[in-house]
Amino acid sequence: QYLFLLFALIVLTGCGGTQKKLTEYVNPFLGTATMWEPEDLGYTRKIKSRTWGAETYPGATLPNAMVQLSPVTQFRSGAGYQYEDTVIYGFSHTAKGHWNLLHVPMLPVVGTIAPGNYCSGFSHEKESAHPGYYQVYLERYKVNAELTSTLRCAYHKYTFGKGDDKSLLVDIRRSNNDVRDWKIEKVDDNTFTGYQDGDGKIYFYAKTNYKIGQVEMVKDDKHEVAVLRFIDSKGVEPLEVKAGFSFVSIENAQMNLKAEMLNKSFAQVAEEADAAWEALLSKIQVAGGTEREKRLFYSTFFHAFKWPALRSDVNHEYTDVRGEVVNNGFHYYTDPSFWDDYRNK
């Protein structure tokens, strides 16, 4: 009798199954498509140009983070990504649903680079996203790109074709704003640093697992880009780039990288990102409703916490509106705009 009761208890316990994680309900692509139809817009379009969408982005980020590591399908656009687009120009490190940011775009490349025409085609069939993680296959260069991030740092992982000559393009002269000033340079065998000054100056300190041969400026009659050439670039290991960012200095960007990411693997950073989102989403537990309604709720919950964005470093320093470096001992964030409160509307 006791054995039967014990067996029944085990069976009933097993029938409960594993509870679905809330991050599994999130669709980071929700809100990335442009609205075209009158029933969505509330009016009939008179011109053929793009109209409004929710202006969300599918890339890797944490709640209210400094870094938003996301694909750019179009510059001078809202969040930089439009679902109906068919090419990717790079993976930028800041984003929101407005026509600015998209700092320091990077793209893995192979072969000779044409600065005016380097973008790669992609398909949604070979693209995926999850809170804190993004993946896409770049058709032109035959590279599988994976991205994850911490609060102030970005982690790029690029798997090239066997025997392909790996390079990294940094479109240092382009963002969603006019770039007034910029700098990029090799510091040592595995480090490059610099800044980009458009609508505010952002600094970066980046480490690569392949030794850097040179940082080459490549120019044509249309544009100029930086290209990192690597020693032993045909190695079998994926190219990995860990980049720390700061709105104060390169030294602070280095400090942020050391504190948050430097000694961690890609898988570890991605797992920690998922855990951070799970902890936030778990603040609200939904009862009832359909699976579709839960996906909508947690996807919009997810998007709502992408902004405002962190602007202070791990030492609490930040650059204020007067351009002065301040340390008040707390986390400093961007001003929230009220119309962005529920960006995924």
Q: Where do the PLM segments sit?
A:
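C-terminal motif of bacterial Sec signal peptides marking the signal peptidase cleavage site
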Residues: 13-14
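Sec-dependent signal peptide recognition
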Residues: 1-6
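Accessory carbohydrate-recognition regions in carbohydrate-active enzymes
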Residues: 18-343
